[in-house]
């Protein structure tokens, strides 16, 4: 059975499992296995949701926000062995519900790697007049 939780103070096991999810999603490549970085990510997020199977974290997602008007959902991923079960959709639903209950009504995200089919049924639409951009630092 999959359970969903808001995480704000991860323990060492949580941190290891979250690092593994970042690596599995290929967002970090061979980047640092830095538990303190992950702890700051979790604590600095407006909300951070994990999906658990028993004691194992099998999915996650988070929102960043100014806490007043806008929020961005990011880092939504599910372990390959647990995909296609609605876990990512439930993570996003829980994040959106929290953001809306906190009064944040503009919620954005960048759908990567053909993930638009996940977000469309949850009410997200493409923005024809916008282009996602980023600036990388070294």
Model-predicted segments: where are they?
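Conserved acetyl-CoA pyrophosphate-binding loop and the N-cap/start of the following alpha-helix
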Residues: 82, 86-94
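Short amphipathic alpha-helix that is part of the acyltransferase structural core
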Residues: 1-32, 130
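A short helix-loop-beta-strand connector motif used in the catalytic cores of GNAT acetyltransferases and
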Residues: 39-50, 129
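Conserved beta-strand in the GNAT
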Residues: 50, 56-65, 72-77
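Short, basic/aromatic recognition patches
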Residues: 32-38
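Conserved active-site alpha-helix within GNAT-family acetyltransferase domains
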Residues: 89, 101-106, 111-137
